[in-house]
Structure formats: structure tokens, C-alpha cells
Amino acid sequence: MVFSAGEENDETVHAKYHDMYLMNLRFLGWKNEHVVGEYTDGRIIMVTKESKNFMLKKVKEILVIANRDLGFPSDSFPIRPNATFLLFISNDKRVAGCVVGESITSACHVILDTRCSVTCETKEIELKNVWKIGNWCCSSEAVPAICGVNRIWVAKEHRRRKIASRLMDCLRCHFLYGYVVGIRELAFTDPSPDGREFAAAYTGTDNFLVYK
């Protein structure tokens, strides 16, 4: 969020946003949590569309913050009905990160090609077998995929602690009952530059899968 110090109106808005940020990230715990990961610095819990309304309400509050940080409209929730939500709860009783996974059937490989990059920037897709998905160029040849990562977010004060990687590991293990989603069965939706860096590092390739 951008504001101007010294501008009374901006400082008031910023103060309200900061208060909302702290309040929404606070998490005292639920009686019937579905814990899918436990660590020395916190735990990961899972929420689905079938979860209690108060649980889904908390997820939406977190997504408002995540959307702001990731550059999406704060009220944007383009999530399929079969979505799975994972929240990382730190030992200081705050939501430190979240990931949203959803079922997909196919995705496309990101293309790293100088000509493609120029073409995408000018929005003139002329290369054969190339599509544009969000901000990225990708192959028009779809490949099978199982799990789409709609959002992956970690609070700024908790970054560089492998929280995103642990969220992804848990998502892969618990997205489908009795099946661990493979790295090559994961796809990301229009990642930010930081998100692209993470996706490449986590999957071990710059040509990871994207979907829309």
C-alpha cells in the first residue's frame, strides 16, 4: 500500500489498513482444526469449501491481505468451487502465509525466449505455437496437470523462512486423498515476478507450468 507521510488523509487510511492487517492476521486457533503439518515455528491447517462458515470467513479475510500484497484487486476471489486453502499459523498466533490450490486438468509450459519476451511486451503474439497467459508467454501445447496454485503468499515479516515451500509440500500431500501431486503436475496462475522466481525454484525449472 502506497501513502504519503505527513498527509493527514493518507496517514489515517494507512493507520486503518495497518489495524485491519494486524486484526485479520491474528489467529487464536479453532477447536476442530484440520492440521496437516506441524513444525517448531508453527503449524499448517487446511480449509475446504465444505468447512464451517467462520473458517471460510477467516480465509477470505486473509485473501484480502494477500491480494493487496500480490497486486490483485482486494475483493478478487476467482477461485473454483473445489478449492483447497492452507494457512501457516506461526507460534505467535498469526497467519504467516497461505496457499490456494484448485483442481485443473491441463496447463502450459512457460517459454523463455528473447523473441517471445519482446512479443509479449508489445502484446503482438506472432510466434507460432505461443499463447499469452496473464503476463507470460507459454507453449500452446497443453499438458496434463492436476493442481493449480491460484494464490501463494507469505507475510513480509515471515519471508525467507521456507514457509511457502512448506505450504506447497503440504498442498501436494493433501490435495488428493491418498496421492501426492508430482512437481510436474503443478501449475501456477499468472505469477508475479517474485512468484515466478519461487515457482522456478520450487519446481526446479524455469519452464514451469501456468494456467488460467
Task: Describe the role of every protein-language-model region.
Residues 1-156, 173-196, 200-212:
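Non-catalytic substrate-recognition and accessory regions of acyl/acetyltransferase enzymes
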Residues 159-171:
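Glycine-rich acyl-CoA binding loop
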